Every structure is written in C-alpha cells, then in structure tokens.
Amino acid sequence: MSLIVTRFAPSPTGYLHIGGLRTAIFNYLFARANQGKFFLRIEDTDLSRNSIEAANAIIEAFKWVGLEHDGEILYQSKRFEIYKEYIQKLLDEDKAYYCYMSKDELDALREEQKARKETPRYDNRYRDFKGTPPKGIEPVVRIKVPQNEIIVFNDGVKGEVKVNTNEIDDFIIARSDGVPTYNFVVTIDDALMGITDVIRGDDHLSNTPKQIVLYKALNFKIPNFFHVPMILNEEGQKLSKRHGATNVMDYQEMGYLKEALVNFLARLGWSYQDKEIFSMQELLELFDPKDLNSSPSCFSWHKLNWLNAHYLKNQSAQELLKLLKPFSFSDLSHLNPAQLDRLLDALKERSQTLKELALKIDEVLIAPVEYEEKVFKKLNQALVMPLLEKFKLELNKVNFNDESALENAMHKIIEEEKIKAGSLMQPLRLALLGKGGGIGLKEALFILGKTESVKRIENFLKN
C-alpha cells in the first residue's frame, strides 16, 4: 500500500469552526492510522480578506485538540511564483488562454442568457482568439476545458460521480491582477504536496470536476476524494452560532475537554458498530473513511454534554486542578488533600463541563448569604431550629476526618428525636449550602470542616 498523505486546508478569513475541525480530524485519523502524513495548509491567497489572527487561531485550535501536523505549515500566499509558473506552462501548451472580456460584457451576456432561460455561463469567445487584444483590458486566464468528455470519479462517500465537460465553462485560473483562483491553487498544492486522499465537506463536490480538469491538463495524479455531508442542527437546518457553529476555542472556554470534543466530532458522520466512546488510540485503530456516512449528521448538545461528563468523571483530582486553571473559582488552599479530593470527586459526578464544575466549587465553598426561598418556606421553624441547635452541639464531639462518623451523628439525632431523615437533612442542607440540592451532606460536612460547618449552621439559626 502506498503512503497515505492527507491535508487540512482552511482559509484564514474567519475562525476555525466545528465543521472544519471535524474535517481535520477525519484527515488526521486516516493518515495516522496508516502511518501516513498529515499536513496543514493555510489557503491565504485572498489577501484582502485574510486575518493573521484567524490563522493563529486555527493553529491554536490544532494545538489544543492535539492534532499534530507533519512538516512546516504551508502558506499559499508565499507560493505565488510557483502558481505563475504553472499558469505559464498551461498558456505555453495552449491549454489555457487570455480572455479579454470586460465585466460589462460578461454581465450583458449573463442577462441575455437569463432572458433565454439558459444557465448563465461564459461563452468561450476568446478560446481560440488570435487577433489583436482590445486596449485597456487586463485579461484573465481561463483553462481550456475539453469538450464532449465525461469526467468520472468514484467518491468514497457519494459513490460514482459523472459530469459532462460541456457543463463546465472555461473557468478562470488567474484573475486580471494575476492572483490565481481557488481551484487552481488547490490543485497545484495537492499535487506538489503528494496528497493521495482528500477528505472535505460536500460543499466542495462541485469543485471536483474542475480540479480534475486541471489535474489532467498538468498530467498530475488525481487523488481519492471523500466528500462528507455537512453537520446540521437538531431541527435539520444548517448549523448557526446558536446551534454549535462557533469558534472551536469557544468550546475550551465553555469547559469542554479536548478528548470529548474529538470523540464527539469523530462520531458525527462516522460510526463503528454501536460504540459511542472512543479514545484517540481506538479512533486510530478503527477509523476508515470508507465508513463515512452519506447522510448529514446532527449536532446534539445533549450528546456532547454526555460525552464530556464521561471524560470529566474519569479525570483524577490533580488532572482536574490543571484543567480548571483557566476558570475562576474559590481559593482551595485552605483544604487539606483529603478534602480537596473529596470535593472534586463529589462535584465531577454532578458536572458536565469544567465551567459548571468551577461554579459548583463556589456553590460549596462560598457560604450562603441567602437561602432558597421555596425550600425555606416549607420548613417547620419550631421543629427545625432546636434540631439544628442540637446537631451543632453533636458536631463538636465528632471526628471530621471520618465521614462515617459524620453520617452517624446525623442518624443519632434522627433516632433520638424520632423524626424522618428529611426533617433534619433538608434544613441542614439549606444551612450548609443555601439550597435544597447539591452534594451529599456527609461530603459537605467533611469538605467544609468543623469550624466552617458550625459557623454556617449558626448563621442559619440567626435568620
């Protein structure tokens, strides 16, 4: 088997979005799974729209999710001389030509074609032009598309695709300012980089016949193509920012783990049996682009949150502390190692993202200044206050390093007072955490410690 070489080639006119990252992941997995090469190419020939910040953000996103590319990053803006050489080669071989048609002429032609209910297209009028070029017109360069030929390629996702070359006009390969066009530079670079397999969104499917025309004109080997359907939202519509089409780095800020995001995106359009959770090593062992789905996949926040919660639960306390550094939360320095481990172990089971985990840390460690009203109103004040007073005194006798002792202290009061467990635990939870839900009470007492627990109960009694 020949060496597999893939690439990801974003345009730095905006930030890397979720669909682009999925494409990069598919290309990365295919190359790495076959001990091949994976390259990153920045398609920045549109100098008026390029953004250095966007290019850097793409690179930053790659680093975050762990997609390591081979070799140096290739910037198309540094390769204009190479493109000019190949344009000249096509001109010299009479496979391309200068077109002097003005914009006004082209617009008029399109209007005439529309009036005749024809598809607007260039009419090849300068294809065999040998006369004197009109003055004042900077020509474009057009490729001579072979006529009456059938282009056939077997797409790895879409199956066999056939296009009659008569449906393709002599498209522009260099604009009047000399800047080469997208389809031209993509073809040149994929050929010179030795790309064997192109995995990309199916919005590029219509470009493929044009690129094949160029491959053949330049006697380049045509790569294999895999055109992946787009990602839709859960209503079956194109992704919007509200539904997930945001900058990849936003997901880091929202508290998603890179392992969860990669797993999630790899499963959007690809599957292996009924398996949902894949480590990177498993993806490398199992991924095959031939298994890519031909139908669009749906972005599900529920699925992403479920996956992220899974990966969050499998992080150690020390790993979580590192991951939590970018987020703002209460100081943990007063906690001993056992309390810290207990805090993170308890909260990671109840959190779906790092951001949510950071908020829950605050909910435990910041003493409540107000109490959940609907829970507070249900309390029998005459019963609750003596119970909490008695429990507070009991806490002074308890070893707070022993969670079972803390649990026994609660059960002792419940048994002595002959009350239901909720009669003590509900007001105690409100006193400690300010609300009716949250981590277990013995966990809360252990994490807060004796001094803080007693202080919170006293503050509640004052209210």
Language model features by range: what are they?
Residues 27, 58, 90, 94, ...:
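Residue-level signal for inorganic ion chemistry
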Residues 1-115, 207-220:
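N-terminal Rossmann-like or analogous alpha/beta NTP/dinucleotide-binding catalytic cores
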